[in-house]
């Protein structure tokens, strides 16, 4: 029991208003309602929408610029952006970078995990998740010439597939590499003229295999898909034996 005069509860820590502004905008970007390259609004518009003062908005924007979720153009207008890998990466992902994990190691582990995901998904996928994958394909069709947006949709495709596996350990296991894979896919779509079409072909074949509950074809196409990234890197002059940090830094 609390003694007389002794506080039973700790004070509630209320987040500063600028942090709430930053979190509100961040949620829109992460949810895909605000896509990379789309205008966020002027400072004056954000002041009016959030009902806070200009300094609060500016501080919130500063946080988002530091995290890479907002950028300014030459006229100082604000746009949603895609963070670089080190801003995506947390926990284990950051340890990968600090320990100079190579892209070869990332590719090998991704190959093992994603083929296991594909095999289980072929057995367990539902009509609802198939519909999500098909919707992802429709959005990807519209983003074929937009490397950053297409790379985000590629991540979404594999996230949906992981849920289809019904195995939460695999879902968690793939998260660190998933965070680090975004810059690689964006780089390929930007620098390899055939990468987007090859990605589309692989995703289409994987969906067809899942619809037929064909484990062998799902695994085969996933293996081809992941191996294709390795070949793509070599074609644009990247070494998969370089550390992840160096691979991105030299892009």
What are these regions (language model features)?
Residues 1-113, 119, 239-243, 247-251:
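Short linear motifs at protein or domain termini
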Residues 110-187, 199-208, 217-232:
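Conserved amphipathic alpha-helical segments that form helical-bundle/coiled-coil interaction surfaces
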Residues 191:
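Luminal/periplasmic acceptor-recognition loop/helix of membrane-associated glycosyltransferases
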Residues 194-197:
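Short helix-capping and inter-helix turn/linker motifs at the boundaries of alpha-helical repeat units
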